[in-house]
Regions:
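C-terminal beta-signal and adjacent terminal beta-strands/loops
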Residues: 71-104, 116-124, 128-180
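Short, surface-exposed alpha-helical recognition segments that flank or form part
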Residues: 1, 114-115
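Short glycine/proline-rich turn/loop motifs
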Residues: 104-110
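Gram-negative outer-membrane beta-barrel transporters
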Residues: 1-77
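Extracellular loop and loop/strand-boundary signature of outer-membrane beta-barrel proteins
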Residues: 8, 34-41, 110-114, 159-164
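Sequence-level detector for tyrosine residue identity
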Residues: 15, 21, 26, 40, ...
Length: 180
């Protein structure tokens, strides 16, 4: 049975005006687990996290709106690779010719979750327009972009292929909704 401790603190600033909304939060957290053999930081332990959100309404009848969200987070823990070795299976028992046999790739790991991935950050933005067709029908159109400056945030590292796998690239999107 594992046990653990999670502790942290948040600082929040918020402004809400007629046209402008601003929200900023900083979170400091520390999570540790103990599996009976060792204490370690789990893979979701993010020490520092900053979110900044702003929304602004403008235009005739405030029918236009822009939204921006920026997020910065310290890297998650991961277990580093110390090295590789050939892991022979000895499938023929004592008769296995280890001089010509091809083994599987074995990985030598460092201590559990002692490494940290690089910091994560991205900017998402959108602009939307609301069109009131009549008293009962409204059309909302939105254009948005996720990861606006195309930050290459790491998702994980493929140890076998020795290849970095990133999270979302820049992703534009468009949408519309009709309410009645």
């Amino acid at each position: 049975v594992e046990s653990g401790i999670a502790k942290g603190v948040d600082a929040l600033l918020k402004y809400k005006g007629k046209k402008l909304y601003i929200w900023a939060v900083y979170s400091l957290g520390l999570i540790t687990r103990n599996d009976g053999e060792r204490e370690y930081n789990p893979h979701f332990d993010r020490r520092h996290n900053v979110n900044f959100v702003t929304s602004y309404k403008f235009g005739k009848n405030e029918s236009w709106k822009t939204d921006i969200r920026w997020n910065l987070g310290s890297g998650f823990p991961f277990t580093q690779t110390q090295g590789f070795y050939e892991n022979l299976t000895f499938s023929d028992g004592i008769n296995t010719d280890y001089t010509t046999a091809n083994g599987d790739l074995g990985i030598e790991y460092a201590d559990l979750n002692k490494g940290r991935l690089p910091y994560y950050h991205r900017l998402d933005a959108s602009v939307s327009k609301s069109i009131k067709v009549n008293k009962k029908v409204n059309i909302d159109m939105t254009a948005s972009v996720t990861n606006a400056y195309n930050r290459e945030n790491i998702f994980y590292f493929n140890r076998v292929k020795y290849e970095r796998v990133n999270q979302l690239p820049i992703m534009p999107s468009f949408g519309a909704s009709i309410t009645f």
